[in-house]
């Protein structure tokens, strides 16, 4: 995760101990109903959404890592819930398209 953070020039917002972990797959979406269809665990969710539903969806979908794009800011409630569920949140100024492209070209695999 620390390499992913570097690639997108990201900033960790919580659960920084998870930066030592590795993730093999990523999924980019602003549509949380699509995220809930995923049958995988341990993936990076790349999104531009910043609401509490994002954290609820990540928890249900077993996505322990979130990348917020376009410089979006997490609310205090989001950060509290992320800490409670041990979900690492990163933030980047890059767009969702650019972030996903950079990560894919650097070896992050697509779920499908």
Regions found by a protein language model. Name each.
Residues 20-44, 48-112:
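Feature captures the catalytic cores and cofactor-binding loops of soluble hydro-lyases/lyases
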